[in-house]
């Protein structure tokens, strides 16, 4: 950054690993649910141990965090409540699932939503006015905005 002081840095904060164990993981941490754990992970852990330290080391550099994990939790919750307008399973192939494996690697619906989050965060695109066809019936633009 010393050679390119005008750079802006965007750091994505992914969801917690092993989605099948989210509730137990949250309870083991003394919290009620995965959303509470993620909020702690973003604000108290990632910001304090990584992002705030980078900002101190490079005060003239703009450093943003993008907690993309929220969209993953929203999509998982929509799946649990049968609110997705697509035939998407919780675990399965990249094209047809939220997660591709037990660790929680993301399927296409999550990756596409994440791309929209980046589009909005980095370029300031207003997603409700954006007509990019995600290939999904579920309104991923709205999920990405929330």
Regions from the language model: what does each represent?
Residues 1-108:
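Alpha-helical cap/lid subdomain in secreted, periplasmic
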Residues 90-146:
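Histidine-centered active-site loop/cap adjacent to the catalytic His
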């Amino acid at each position: 950054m010393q050679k390119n002081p005008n750079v802006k840095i965007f750091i994505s904060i992914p969801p917690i690993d092993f989605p099948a164990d989210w509730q137990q993981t949250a309870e083991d941490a003394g919290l009620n649910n995965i959303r509470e754990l993620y909020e702690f992970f973003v604000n108290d852990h990632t910001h304090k141990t990584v992002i705030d330290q980078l900002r101190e080391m490079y005060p003239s550099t703009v450093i943003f965090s993008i907690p993309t994990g929220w969209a993953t939790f929203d999509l998982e919750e929509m799946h649990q409540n049968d609110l997705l307008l697509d035939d998407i399973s919780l675990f399965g192939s990249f094209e047809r699932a939220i997660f591709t494996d037990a660790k929680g690697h993301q399927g296409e619906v999550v990756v596409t939503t994440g791309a929209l989050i980046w589009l909005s965060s980095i370029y300031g695109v207003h997603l409700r006015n954006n007509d990019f066809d995600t290939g999904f019936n579920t309104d991923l633009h709205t999920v990405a905005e929330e």
